[in-house]
C-alpha cells in the first residue's frame, strides 16, 4: 500500500478501525509545553493556556471521538475557542464534541458560503465522494435536497483577527488556497503557524506530493495565485514550527522555508505554464499532456495531479466553451456513438481496436472506444471485459490515491455488469 493511499484510508477510519486494518493507532504528538496534536485523518490541535484551551480544527465526524479521547488528558480547564482553518468536513466534524457553554468558534467569513455550497449540492456530491473511496452511497436522486448548512461559528472575520487567552496571543489571517475561507493561525510567542490544508503533508518526509489544485469530486476553482500569496504570508512570519491539516510537524525555519518555497514555486510553475499555453492557443487536453513538473521540485503526484490542476486552472479562467460550435448545443458526442458502431460494422471491430489500443499501452483510448460500444449496447460483454482490463491496468499503474479510488469504483461497476465479484 502506498503512503498516499494509506493516508486516504485514515480519512474514513478512526483509531479502532485503523488498528483492525493493521495500522498502528496514533498517539498524541507533543509540539511544545502548550501544543499537542492528535494525528488522525485530519490533525486536531489543542493549545493550552492558564485561562483555558483553544482547539484548532476538530477532525471528521468519524474520527473526532478518537481525537477527543487522545487529547482528554491534556485538557485542563474550559475550551474557550475553537478555530476552524477551513470548512471542509474533515476539519469541522468534531465541533459538537469540543464545544462547551460559552465556547467561541472562529472562522473566516467565506466559511458560510463554502458550507452552504456543500449542503446545497449534497445529492450531487455524496455519490461522488463515496466513489472516490469505493464506498456505497445513496443515488443522487434519493437525496431530498438540502440548501442550507448548520452554521457553528460565532465569530467571523475578513482579513485579520486576534485575541489573547491566558497571556498567549493568537493572530488569525485570511489565507485562501485550498478553500476561499482558509485561514492561518499564528502564535508569535511560539513562532508557530497552523496552516491547515494550504500545505499538505502527504508523502512526507520525502518526496511529498504536489497539491490538489483541483478536486475532481467537484469543487469551485482553487485560485493558484491566491494560494501562492497565502504561502508567502506564512513565509513572511518566519515561523520555527509549521503545523498542517495533514502530515507531520515541520520544524526549523530553514526546513520550513525550503519545503514551502518548493511547494509555492511548483504551483507557480504549473499556473504560469498553463496561462502561457492558453495565450498561445493550445487547448486544455494538449496542455494536460504537455505540462510536467521539472525534476528539481521533487514532488510526487500521490495526492494532487498536475494534469488535473492544469485543467482546473484552464477551466477556472475560461469556463467550459472550447470554441467548437458543436459544444454550444445540448446534444453530446455520445448521441452519435451508436451510429459510429453501425458504420464500423457492429461492435466487434470497435472492441478489437480497443484491445489493440490496450496492447499498445493506450488504456485511456481503450476506455473511450468502449464508451462508444456501450452507448449502443450497455451490456455488450466483450466491451465490458475490455473496459475492465483497461481500468485494471490504470489502477495497477497509478500512485494517486484519488485516481485509484475512482478506478476502483469503475472496476466495481464493470464487474457488476459482467456479473463477476
Q: What do these predicted ranges mean?
A:
Residues 20-21, 123-124, 235-241, 249-421:
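Accessory terminal helices/loops
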Residues 30-31, 53, 58-62, 113-174, 219-238, ...:
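Metallo-beta-lactamase
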Residues 42-44, 60-63, 87-91, 111-113, ...:
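Solvent-exposed loop/turn segments at secondary-structure junctions
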Residues 34, 47, 57, 71, ...:
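Divalent metal-coordination and catalytic microenvironments
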Residues 25-74, 184-198:
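Conserved beta-strand hairpin/beta-sheet module of binuclear metal-dependent hydrolase folds
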Residues 4-16:
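Bacterial N-terminal signal peptides
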Residues 22, 51, 62-107, 156, ...:
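Active-site metal-binding motif and surrounding structural segment of the metallo-beta-lactamase
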Amino acid at each position: 500500500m502506498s503512503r498516499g493511499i494509506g493516508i486516504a484510508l485514515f480519512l474514513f477510519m478512526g483509531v479502532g478501525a485503523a488498528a483492525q486494518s493493521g495500522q498502528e493507532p496514533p498517539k498524541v504528538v507533543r509540539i511544545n509545553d502548550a501544543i499537542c496534536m492528535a494525528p488522525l485523518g485530519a490533525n486536531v490541535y489543542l493549545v493550552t493556556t492558564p485561562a483555558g484551551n483553544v482547539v484548532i480544527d476538530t477532525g471528521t465526524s468519524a474520527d473526532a471521538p478518537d481525537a477527543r479521547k487522545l487529547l482528554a488528558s491534556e485538557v485542563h480547564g474550559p475550551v474557550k475557542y475553537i478555530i476552524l482553518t477551513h470548512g471542509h468536513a474533515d476539519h469541522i466534524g468534531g465541533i459538537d464534541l469540543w464545544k462547551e457553554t460559552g465556547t467561541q468558534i472562529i472562522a473566516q467569513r467565506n466559511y458560510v458560503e463554502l458550507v452552504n455550497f456543500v449542503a446545497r449540492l449534497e445529492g450531487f456530491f455524496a455519490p461522488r465522494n463515496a466513489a472516490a473511496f469505493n464506498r456505497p452511497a445513496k443515488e443522487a436522486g434519493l437525496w431530498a435536497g438540502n440548501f442550507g448548512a448548520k452554521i457553528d461559528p460565532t465569530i467571523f472575520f475578513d482579513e485579520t483577527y486576534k485575541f489573547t487567552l491566558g497571556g498567549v496571543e493568537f493572530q488569525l489571517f485570511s489565507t485562501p488556497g485550498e478553500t476561499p475561507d482558509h485561514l492561518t493561525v499564528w502564535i508569535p510567542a511560539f513562532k508557530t503557524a497552523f496552516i491547515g490544508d494550504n500545505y499538505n503533508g502527504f508523502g512526507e518526509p520525502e518526496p511529498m506530493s504536489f497539491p490538489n489544485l483541483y478536486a475532481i469530486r467537484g469543487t469551485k476553482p482553487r485560485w493558484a495565485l491566491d494560494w501562492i500569496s497565502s504561502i508567502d504570508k506564512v513565509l513572511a512570519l518566519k515561523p520555527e514550527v509549521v503545523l498542517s491539516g495533514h502530515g507531520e510537524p515541520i520544524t526549523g525555519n530553514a526546513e520550513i522555508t525550503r519545503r514551502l518555497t518548493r511547494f509555492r514555486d511548483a504551483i507557480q510553475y504549473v499556473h504560469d505554464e498553463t496561462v502561457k499555453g492558453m495565450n498561445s492557443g493550445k487547448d486544455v487536453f494538449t496542455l494536460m499532456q504537455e505540462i510536467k513538473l521539472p525534476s528539481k521540485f521533487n514532488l510526487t503526484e500521490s495526492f494532487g495531479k498536475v494534469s488535473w490542476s492544469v485543467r482546473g486552472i484552464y477551466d477556472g479562467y475560461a469556463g467550459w466553451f472550447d470554441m467548437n460550435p458543436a459544444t454550444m448545443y445540448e446534444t453530446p458526442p455520445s448521441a452519435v456513438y451508436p451510429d459510429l458502431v453501425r458504420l464500423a460494422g457492429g461492435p466487434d471491430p470497435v472492441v478489437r481496436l480497443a484491445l489493440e489500443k490496450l496492447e499498445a499501452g493506450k488504456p485511456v483510448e481503450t476506455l473511450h472506444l468502449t464508451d462508444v460500444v456501450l452507448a449502443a449496447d450497455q451490456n455488450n460483454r466483450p466491451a465490458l471485459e475490455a473496459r475492465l482490463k483497461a481500468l485494471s491496468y490504470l489502477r495497477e499503474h497509478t500512485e494517486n490515491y484519488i485516481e485509484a479510488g475512482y478506478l476502483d469504483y469503475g472496476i466495481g461497476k464493470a464487474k457488476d455488469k459482467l456479473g463477476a465479484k
